[in-house]
Amino acid sequence: MAEELLSHEPATGALLWRSPVGDVDEEVAAARAGWAGWAARPVAFRIETLRRFANTVRARADAFADLIARETGKPLWEAKTEIDSVVAKVDISVSAYAERTAQRRLDSPMGARTSVRHKPHGVLAVLGPYNFPAHLPNGHTVPALLAGNAVVFKPSEKTPATGAFLVECYHAAGVPAECMRLVIGGPAAGKALAEHPGIDGLLFTGSARTGLALNRAFANKPEKILALEMGGNNPIVVWDTPDVDTAATIVVQSAFTSAGQRCTAARRLIVQDALYDPLVAAIDKLAGRLIVGAPHDDPQPFMGPVIDNPAADGLQDGFVGLLTRGGRVIRHLVRSDPDLPFLSPAMIDVTDMPDRPDAELFGPILQVFRAHDFDEAIEEANATRYGLAASLISQTPALYDRFWAGIRAGVVNWNRPTNGAPSNAPFGGVGWSGNHRPSAYYAADYCAYPVVSSEAEAARAAIGIGLRDP
């Protein structure tokens, strides 16, 4: 019997989907055979095909959102916003392609001309995460296909049904099946795809642990493009603000949206000493009002479960680890059912903890640090190997100027949540958060390589120095 991959609903434990495990060699070979024909198509044809893809997703939005909600456990309202992002990615990518990789002509001497054009890499592997199993891999796939590449997509083994649905939408829209391939499988399939000699590069969104392993694996393969979008141990700093309730709302949105399963979620709250007591009390009160429930519950939940029981187990272990290191509980991490991965929002003070761990606890856990001056706040915010997102809540513009100049992160926000990033801008981080290949609007940059050509319609040449007389 062929090996199968099963997907279960986090909120119920029920079996949702099953499929045989795919063959990496077959999928890469198919993409290798088909990509040249796709690349040879005019860019206008590829744009029109991808716009049909957006329309296909729009037409299937209800079924798609329902599937995402059931497979990830996120609330249905949030799954619907993910569908909106999938649809919007096409027009955003078309604009980015035109702006960043369009043909350009440069002035040249002696009647020649210089042109800058771009070529696709060939076959690109895409490894997707489970937290946004449609939107995030789609953010690699749309610009890759637009540039003329073929794609071999392996969704997370935790959300394979969503990945399969996404690929079905591409095929239904007219993207050639040989140019949009799907690999169903677990970590072994992902490793085999990453190491396959038939790919020309890999585009990844996921954990720092996996990203670092990929970075090592590609270290002696400079001929292959590698774009890494990893996690963050993101700080949110609250300083000099009279509106404590609004600050608390922004902190809760930053830390607990998507049950904390966003790479840009706030993991650390750094708060001015004078604001500590009222702010922490306001956050604690608001966190206690958040509805944690299943995707289709009524009233609608603010957040659902984390992705599965092993993830919940790991978060509980991580919270206990903070306690044993000297953390002080503000709000306990509560698991309402030991057989399901529902967790309540949790807060823990780590101000007096020596050797605070620099780890991304990918769930609804917020660590709180009391700072006595703004320099200490920035120093604490930068006390991480990651560098994805950071936010300052303050009514003082001069403080934001200092914060922006001093913080090391790829997304730096002011009076906005850490997990807010515009789609028409680059998205990425430094340190363990990425390898300086930002995605979103700048994904066009890693999906094609520039070619510079000096051109003249007639050959003209002369050597004026260094020749003996004839």
Please provide the spans of the model-predicted regions.
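Residue-level signal for inorganic ion chemistry
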Residues: 13, 46, 68, 90, ...
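A short hydrophobic/small-residue beta-strand
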Residues: 150-152, 329, 411
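N-terminal Rossmann-like NAD(P)+-binding subdomain of aldehyde/semialdehyde dehydrogenases
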Residues: 1-113
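ALDH superfamily catalytic-core signature
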Residues: 174, 210-352, 414, 462-463, ...
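Short, well-ordered beta-strand elements within core beta-sheets of diverse protein domains
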Residues: 16-19, 33-40, 126, 236-239, ...
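Conserved C-terminal structural/oligomerization subdomain of aldehyde/semialdehyde dehydrogenase
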Residues: 9-18, 199, 335, 342-470
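Rossmann-like NAD(P) dinucleotide-binding subdomain of oxidoreductase/dehydrogenase enzymes
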Residues: 104-246, 371
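Structural signal for hydrophobic packing residues in well-ordered secondary-structure cores
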Residues: 35, 39, 54-61, 65, ...
